[in-house]
A protein has these predicted regions:
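C-terminal target-recognition/interaction regions appended to catalytic cores
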Residues: 238-457
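A SAM-dependent methyltransferase catalytic signature shared across enzymes that methylate proteins
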Residues: 128-143, 164-168
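Conserved S-adenosyl-L-methionine
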Residues: 48-49, 114, 136-148
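Flexible, glycine-/basic-rich loop-and-beta segments that form/coincide
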Residues: 151-242
Length: 457
């Protein structure tokens, strides 16, 4: 059958449906660089730009409409403005409806972020369903993450599929059921790592090596005594602190109550003014948006960190200076896995605004549009043939002591897009594009159940 690929990006829907023998007859993508790549990879398919400028009658007839419509208005990482998005991206769903109204394709296949069903307390999703129903479509929806099918990435996405009702008001959608992921499936990041990949690699910066060394020491010391790692975030600013917080937030306390207490890192709060005293508190206590109330979850987090410090004060006081010279985000830490192998080299590391996070080797987190959160693979070896940095300079083996960031080739493998030609995209541009793409294998699994079987050419 013929299909169109709207908000096409790298062409994930195109790859998946082509595998099943269907033919793409039209694509739309507003990003000019991605347009060029689409033409490079699919030269026989006409691709246009801004969908709002394309007349529905200029789009070829088709039986399937595919669209990974813009997710930022509904995502956790975006502002979650939905249909009120200031850039107009939320209203792009209406462009899909405009094309459906004109062409009436039998099938629709849409993809968005997992936050969409709950956006605006469910009202956004309710409007989408109402609009599709008014156009004659029965729909089903489901949230899948690639790791449920053995693909080593945790990336929940919301899939919407639908069929057009016939003159008798029947669509056949009642026969469709989403695939149930296999039980006990195991994924492993190492399955997508190529030890000899040396194309535009980015090693962990050397100034991060002592930071990782220090946190590795911290984990070893805590687990040696306690036998486990706390699941809460480690805020080193609370180590040695004793300022009061249970009744009134410190930013609203009197000078007399603050003076003489210990603030961030156990340092004495000193100064003649409230501003000087508050400046010595942890950064999250310097805010004044809370007055007579303070969130209970923050109180719990502070108590947990102070209790951790008291259990380990004998060695933390000697350890803390090792981490103090580094940026604030590197002085916070989270052990985000149930795995009790305490060696960082057997996990995935992520640098986040909320701190350093250790994750399971079973899957990488979402390849985000924020390249600073790109997963680090500390187990990735130094290629036997050497490697060059992004400026073309040779790396040394010691540069890889803490591994490297996931490569753009590995990111493509995770999204099942390794067969594409990425032209002259920079590493950052490629990772961003892959982070916004649909997972080809997951789309193919759903399409197999939705669409009639076709024999690939």
């Amino acid at each position: 059958m013929r299909f169109i690929d709207l908000f096409a990006g790298l062409g994930g829907f195109h790859l998946a449906l082509s595998r099943l023998g269907h033919q793409c007859v039209f694509a739309s993508e507003i990003n000019s660089k991605l347009q060029k790549l689409y033409r490079l990879n699919f030269p026989d398919v006409p691709i246009e730009g801004d969908i709002t400028q394309i007349k529905a009658e200029d789009i070829p007839p088709h039986e399937i409409l595919c669209a990974g419509f813009p997710c930022q208005p509904f995502s956790f990482s975006g502002k979650k403005q939905g249909f009120e998005d200031e850039l107009g991206r939320g209203n792009l769903f209406d462009e899909i409806c405009r094309i459906l109204r004109y062409h009436h394709p039998k099938y629709i296949f849409l993809e968005n972020v997992s936050a969409l069903p709950g956006h605006d307390n469910g009202r956004t999703w309710k409007v989408i369903k109402q609009k599709l129903d008014a156009l004659g479509y029965d729909i089903r929806s489901h949230i899948y993450s690639p790791h449920e099918f053995g693909i080593p990435q945790h990336r929940p996405r919301f899939y919407i599929v639908g069929m057009l009702r016939n003159e008798q008001g029947v669509s056949g959608m009642h026969r469709f059921h989403f695939l149930r992921p296999p039980k006990d499936v195991v994924s492993d990041v190492r399955s997508i790592v190529d030890p000899e990949d040396n194309d535009r690699l980015v090693a962990v910066r050397r100034d991060l090596h002592p930071v990782f060394d220090a946190w590795q020491e911290f984990v070893y010391n805590v687990t040696k005594r306690d036998g486990f790692m706390p699941s809460h975030c480690i805020f080193t600013m609370e180590f040695g602190a004793d300022y009061e917080f249970e009744d009134v937030p410190p930013a609203f306390q009197s000078v007399e109550r603050l003076r003489g207490r210990r603030g961030a890192y156990g340092r004495l709060l000193e100064g003649d003014t409230r501003e000087e005293l508050i400046a010595g508190l942890p950064f999250y206590m310097q805010r004044t948006k809370y007055s007579d109330t303070f969130p209970e979850f923050k109180k719990i987090l502070i108590r947990q960190n102070r209790e951790l410090y008291q259990r380990h004060k004998d060695w933390i006081d000697l350890w803390l200076p090792k981490i103090l010279p580094y940026p604030r985000t590197q002085r916070m830490f989270e052990w985000s896995t149930t795995n009790q192998d305490w060696d960082f080299k057997h996990h995935v590391i992520q640098l986040r605004p909320s701190g350093i996070r250790i994750r399971s080797i079973n899957c990488v987190p979402t390849i985000t549009l924020c390249t600073t959160a790109t997963p680090i693979l500390p187990f990735a070896p130094f290629p036997s043939k050497g490697a060059l940095d992004k400026k073309g300079r040779p790396y040394k083996p010691e540069d890889f002591r803490w591994g490297r960031y996931i490569s753009h080739n590995e990111a493509a493998r995770i999204q099942s897009m390794q067969e594409l030609n990425y032209g002259k995209l920079s590493r950052v541009q490629k990772v961003k594009a892959l982070g916004n793409a649909v997972n080809v294998d997951v789309v193919e699994l759903i399409a197999k159940r939705l669409l009639p079987k076709r024999t690939p050419k």
